[in-house]
């Protein structure tokens, strides 16, 4: 029987299918569409892994609330993940950890964190990226979300005069008790006008900034809501995952908890956070070498490259509350209170379900979206898989949010979960001592490596099973299918491969070797600096580096359609360049972007090509390339470098400023987005600026430039430059008046042509 490959397209999105074929040289695939399915899957898994049915009705929200700790009922097939945490075991592990690190270890760490927190300014909260904004109920940049929250305090009670993080935290706790909260909100008013020519009625939507208010109950749900999105940029996966972003009311408290956890992680040698890069490699290397020192002559080690299944769904906020209570037991009352707020808020969190579920008919010709609020009403239309997801959770859902007392969502409390993981690596008991076995390892959030040490193979087996059992008690599930053991000093940890020493992983740097697409001047220098860095890190051998340099050159020429002057390649751009090259005597001085040849080799990677060719250039050509008054000359201090894995790296720009260092501007229009209300506010601000300027002419105010056409923008810029030139004495008053007249005529012509 032949298999028809096109059948695969019937039940899968084309976008998700394409994502499996993405190459490592390009950017990773982005996720599209609704994230509701992934969110529902996460919530259902969290409830399933609790392995219990003990529920009480929540007094605050009147929703059934499941218990996630100390109540394991279903003990069948414990190989599968379990998220039920035994609190007494957790406290026992924390005690062992403190004993090993020395008495007063936690107290000292919390004191360090306290001094930092007391100095912290609440503007530190603007550092995050996307944040859930409770006033507009959608995602905003962190700074905007913070501003809107501060505005809400101002509207309800008066201006917020605090400056430190603690004052902001106190205000947030006060807000949770207010009976009514007012905040700014953009409303659209529909106006009907008659068109004078056609006589038809025209509807226009006008955004108006108004003030809205909500009651205490509604605010409590909004404050505890965590928004979910589909995770972008995952390679080689058909199914997407949901990630979370909390609101500005939860953020300050989680920041405090993370500060405390960071101070602990810095002092634990098994922790892979918060350091990174070469510093992390050095830390791991010392852990591995110290293991060899601890072993006896008759013992041997096995390395296990571990994988935890469903890490986030099995982490419990209640367990974090107990752990933080133990960590802060000898500390000040202030820290005891502050650290307990974040886990309590997470114990009562609501998860936003997203845009809704997409349905289509059997022939895939029509599609419709059921919104999250109406999913209960149109249950009968759903496919079986959606029904099975939705029905068990129906009693926990209110409008478009779902009550989830247990489980964490991706990206929350990374440091604290590392402390929890390291506590299992510190475990030791009498039985292990009697058999002469022990274990140690490395932990970085949900990624870990285990070094199991024993004298024979049967004891090794027993040690690993013992470790697995200890982890199960506190909700960490080592996946037996995905974890593999190998000989000593051979493992992988957070995408770093270790074989006696760290082996380079060149695939991660591949996109960085290609042309970045900034401009002709920066691109080649940036690629050369990456090759140089990788040679220093032992990632590239000289021969591979030479190959990388040649590939870079070929791609650079193909991107900018510039080939060597004697290659006889035809093309629109090469025609223009060849005419210009005829006028130059010494052709060795030509830059690559002007049809020159490569002069750099491996030993001169750190020298930009402009410097190498400076002496060989014709004087006229040199003056043209390095002319600071040329409008194309521009210099940026930093440059963004893309990688196959992890965030964009920002490096120093080592390129020499030449006429090839131009910058292209993106034309961004706000007219057809829902940011028009911001523009309306900007216009009002502009009016005030103009009034102020008309009274105080010497005042130095930068008025915002609102909605403008390109023509208006050019005129504005020309006038500004002319005025500046006149002020410094570069042009005379008569010339300035002449320029003004020319611009006025151009404006007149432009308006008449309309």
UniProtKB/Swiss-Prot annotation:
Motif (Nuclear localization signal): 189-197, 205-218
Domain of life according to the entry: Viruses
Keywords: Eukaryotic host gene expression shutoff by virus, Eukaryotic host transcription shutoff by virus, Host cytoplasm, Host gene expression shutoff by virus, Host nucleus, Host-virus interaction, Inhibition of host RNA polymerase II by virus, Nucleotide-binding, Nucleotidyltransferase, Phosphoprotein, RNA-directed RNA polymerase, Transferase, Viral RNA replication, Viral transcription
Occurrences of domain RdRp catalytic (ranges): 288-484
EC number from the UniProt entry: 2.7.7.48
EC top class named in words: transferase
UniProt modification remark: Phosphorylated by host PRKCA.
GO molecular function: nucleotide binding; RNA binding; RNA-directed RNA polymerase activity
Catalysed reactions listed for this entry: RNA(n) + a ribonucleoside 5'-triphosphate = RNA(n+1) + diphosphate
InterPro entries registered for this protein in UniProt: RNA-dir_pol_NSvirus, RNA_pol_PB1_influenza
Region described as Promoter-binding site: 251-258
Disulfide pairings: none
Compartments in which it is found: Host nucleus; Host cytoplasm
Cellular component, GO annotation: host cell cytoplasm; host cell nucleus
Example GO biological process: DNA-templated transcription
Assembly and binders: Influenza RNA polymerase is composed of three subunits: PB1, PB2 and PA. Interacts (via N-terminus) with PA (via C-terminus). Interacts (via C-terminus) with PB2 (via N-terminus); this interaction is essential for transcription initiation.
Family according to the record: Belongs to the influenza viruses polymerase PB1 family.
Function: RNA-dependent RNA polymerase which is responsible for replication and transcription of virus RNA segments. The transcription of viral mRNAs occurs by a unique mechanism called cap-snatching. 5' methylated caps of cellular mRNAs are cleaved after 10-13 nucleotides by PA. In turn, these short capped RNAs are used as primers by PB1 for transcription of viral mRNAs. During virus replication, PB1 initiates RNA synthesis and copy vRNA into complementary RNA (cRNA) which in turn serves as a template for the production of more vRNAs.
Protein name per UniProt: RNA-directed RNA polymerase catalytic subunit
Organism per entry: Influenza C virus (strain C/Johannesburg/1/1966)
Gene: PB1
